[in-house]
Swiss-Prot record:
Any Gene Ontology biological process: protein localization to outer membrane
Stored CDD domains: ABC_MJ0796_LolCDE_FtsE
Gene name of this polypeptide: lolD
Keyword terms: ATP-binding, Cell inner membrane, Cell membrane, Membrane, Nucleotide-binding, Translocase, Transport
The protein's name in its UniProt record: Lipoprotein-releasing system ATP-binding protein LolD
Length: 227
């Protein structure tokens, strides 16, 4: 495999239900994502967009096919090993920021680093650098409720990359923001991806933002296709 390929899906199948109620969402889906690449996933609700992200992020097991991350096949691994890969290699950003309300912005970004075994000092330094990079270093001591929507989402992005993953999966990361704020947040996300060499798959309904990414894909009849 090309060493620059971070994520590769080969013939991925995903079903829900059984018997007469069996619903096939992904039907032999193929997709690859390279280091430093930002790809937009633009698809109507109900076509399998979130399912694709969940399978790619090792949150769900595919019913067929193969998921490979940085050259390592993830199918057949124990849940413990899948969790370890997820924590080490993958960052997630969602439409709702899911920040812990009782902790400051800085502490929210520190949390995954502390869980990963970094010292308090190391986590604090890294979190501060990320806040500065996202241009909200002055807001580090504020709790989520004291931040604007755009600031909250930038904290969520910083938290997602706190452990220096190689793959970023984002599900409608600007969906709750007004167009101007959405553009500003995407600018910050794009700069972070380019600077760090992350591979990013971003699900969005925002066609303007999708047009600024390297490629656009959709899901048609259970397969991933470019458009």
């Amino acid at each position: 495999m090309n060493r620059n390929v971070v994520l590769k899906l080969t013939g991925v199948e995903r079903h829900y239900g059984q018997g007469d109620t069996l619903l096939t969402i992904l039907k032999g889906a193929d997709f690859s994502l390279a280091k430093g690449e930002i790809v937009a996933l633009v698809a109507p609700s109900g076509t399998g967009k979130s399912t694709l992200l969940h399978v790619a992020g090792l949150l769900e097991h595919p019913d067929g096919g193969e998921v490979t991350i940085n050259g390592h096949a993830c199918d057949g691994l124990s849940d413990e090993k899948r969790t370890a890969i997820r924590r080490r290699e993958i960052g997630f950003v969602y439409q709702f920021h899911h920040l812990l309300p009782e902790f400051s912005a800085l502490e929210n970004i520190m949390m995954p680093q502390l869980i990963a075994g970094l010292s308090w000092k190391e986590a604090q330094e890294r979190a501060g650098q990320l806040l500065d990079y996202m241009r909200i270093g002055h807001r580090g001591s504020h709790r989520p409720a004291e931040l604007s929507g755009g600031e909250q989402q930038r904290v969520a992005i910083a938290r997602a990359v706190a452990n220096a993953p190689t793959l970023l999966l984002a599900d409608e990361p600007t969906g709750n923001l007004d167009p101007e704020t959405a553009s500003y947040v995407f600018d910050a996300l794009e700069a972070l991806v380019r600077q760090s060499g992350l591979a990013a798959l971003i699900a969005t309904h925002n066609h303007e933002l999708a047009g600024r990414m390297d490629r656009r894909v959709t899901i048609s009849d259970g397969k991933v296709v470019e458009f």
